[in-house]
Amino acid sequence: MEFLTNEKLTIVGAAGMIGSNMVQTALTMRLTNDICLYDVFSPEGVAEEMRQSGFGDVKITATTDAKEAFTNAKYIISSGGAPRKAGMTREDLLKGNCEIAEGLGKNIKEYCPDVKHVVIIFNPADLTGLVTLLYSGLKPSQVTTLAALDSTRLQSALAKKFNVMQSEVKGCATYGGHGEQMAVFGSHVTIDGKPLTEIIGTPEFTNEEWEQMKTDVTKGGAKIIELRGRSSFQSPAYLSVEMIRAVMGGEPFKYPVGTYVSTDKYNHIMMAMNTTLDTTGAHYTVPQGTAEENAKLDASYEHLCKMRDELVTLNIVPEISKWNEINPDRKSTRLNSSHQAISYAVFCLK
């Protein structure tokens, strides 16, 4: 079986649970024959176990040295931040993990400025992704964050409720921030071909049940901690590798991703939009839902802006007016109007 590429993939945080699962997933998918495992704690144990798995003609290296890890890297996935613990929100990780993101961005700029794509998954991902983008000097289309986990949680919940396969639940999406203020969109969802909007408010699925499901989706990460005693690791690992696979030339990624947004309404922020992610990177359109859904998206954006402004106060990023000094190439890649309708129609069929 051929590899998608022979270019170097660096996995940051590879000694941890998410990182080590990303390594195994990437090897199983045969993404590349050149994988580097990087962590501040030696990931050699992970590398040795992967070698002993017998994946064959793959170069697996492990290092704690940033220069070795990032030099010649063309693709990067980073889970290299502190995980969320019981009782914590993603926002509680803001200062420490954004400082880590600053270092990551600077390492990218110094050692692999020609990297093709970077996926950020450590929380709060919208902000750690933004910080990485700013300090890396990369284009917005080259840096994305994991947001799909919220959409798959909605899909999973609906599939369980209506006793259907997840593949029969289409159009699931959450937009805005990857946190409890996310905007859950149900207006484009179909269950086995039937619009969800025709089911909500019936005895089969009451308004109260739908509201509770949306709340449960926004707290899906906390539920995993409750059930397993630790934060999610298998699902974010798999979805993030699927993201990098899409950029390497695999099937386009079918769920929303976090991307840098620059519109008249939403600006100077990273958040989940209706996106395409493929070999050209990330491109987005602004989702259109019901008035209530759009208002939720506005509120999610405002919440992200408050955290972004806190990063300015903490001196992790400069004032917005000075962002061009550290990354002048921040023009976002929004799809033109002729592609927006096509993109959204295709998403609703996913």
Report the location of each language-model feature.
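Conserved N-terminal Rossmann-fold NAD(P) cofactor-binding segment
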Residues: 6, 31-74, 88, 309, ...
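Conserved glycine-rich cofactor-binding loop
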Residues: 15
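N-terminal Rossmann-fold NAD(P) dinucleotide-binding loop
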Residues: 19-20
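Conserved S-adenosyl-L-methionine
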Residues: 28-34, 137-140
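A structured beta-alpha segment of the ubiquitous adenosine-cofactor-binding alpha/beta core
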Residues: 54-75, 81-90, 96-113
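Rossmann-like NAD(P)(H) cofactor-binding subdomain of soluble oxidoreductases
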Residues: 89-157
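C-terminal substrate-binding/catalytic lobe of Rossmann-fold NAD(P)-dependent dehydrogenases
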Residues: 136-141, 151-330, 334
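Single conserved hydrophobic/aromatic residue that forms the stacking wall/gate
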Residues: 329-331, 335-350
